[in-house]
A protein has these predicted regions:
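Conserved G1/Walker A P-loop phosphate-binding module
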Residues: 1-85
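Switch II of P-loop NTPase G domains
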Residues: 17, 57-62, 75, 81-111, ...
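Conserved nucleotide-binding/hydrolysis micro-motifs of P-loop NTPases
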Residues: 56, 82-84, 120-122, 147-152, ...
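Short, glycine/charged-enriched secondary-structure capping and boundary segments
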Residues: 21-22, 40-42, 90-93, 128-132, ...
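Residue-level signal for inorganic ion chemistry
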Residues: 63, 146, 186
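Canonical P-loop GTPase G-domain recognition
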Residues: 2-15, 150-205
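Conserved protein kinase catalytic core
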Residues: 15, 46, 85-88, 124, ...
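Conserved C-terminal guanine-recognition region of P-loop GTPase G domains, centered on the G4
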Residues: 99-171
């Protein structure tokens, strides 16, 4: 699916967040897990900045997404700071209470959390802690196993089984930004979350 997209804002404080009119899809994960590459792959062009340096993103970056032929955007992608590297962990933790935690706990337009994990390494405690936190605050989530093209069929099956058993998450998708593996399945999850958000908004208050 080809879509149109535009960068909106890089927010380093909750006061800089845009309005909450559209459903938002948050991309979370360890540093260098490939969040920006997954976003660029989904959108079909390079809009999120990629870097080989861990922890490059220090802000929540908002991108509006519009279906072709539609005059207005339909959803928002948000790229959150990565975690897991000691040299950036202190800086991220300093900002957690300022804008990351308020975004994940209080943002009314947050429709789906996409937790990206590297399929090539064992399950990490930091990923488990994030998922436990998201479940505790009632967030809808899907786990995306990135860089899946680097594994053979048997290796990938074993990795997914291990990740599913560890994280106890039924919605687990193998993804490759390089080959496009899992792209349509992930779009299905995003569209379903957007539809659920719209239905919830339509209910009488």
């Amino acid at each position: 699916m080809r879509v149109l997209s535009r960068f909106i804002v890089a927010a380093s404080d909750a006061r800089h967040f845009p309005g909450e009119d559209l459903p938002e899809m948050a991309f979370l994960g360890r540093s260098n897990v490939g969040k920006s590459s997954v976003i660029n792959s989904l959108l079909g062009h390079k809009i999120a900045r990629t870097s080989s340096s861990p922890g490059r993103t220090r802000t929540i970056n908002f991108f509006e997404v519009r279906w072709p032929g539609r005059p207005k955007p339909q959803i928002i992608f948000t790229d959150l700071p990565g975690y897991g590297y000691a040299k950036v962990l202190r800086e991220i933790s300093q900002h957690w209470a300022t804008f990351i935690e308020p975004y994940l706990t209080k943002r009314a337009s947050l429709a789906l959390c996409l937790v990206l994990i590297d399929s090539n390494i064992p399950p990490q405690n930091s990923d488990q802690q994030l998922m436990d936190f998201l479940r505790a605050v009632g967030r809808r989530l899907v786990v995306v196993a990135t860089k899946s093209d680097r594994l053979s069929g048997n290796q990938l099956a074993s990795s997914l089984q291990n990740l599913s058993r560890t994280f106890r998450e039924p919605r687990l998708l193998a993804y490759s930004a390089k080959t496009g593996m899992g792209r349509e399945q992930l779009w299905q999850e995003i569209r379903a979350a957007a539809a659920a958000f719209s239905e919830q908004r339509a209910l009488p208050s």
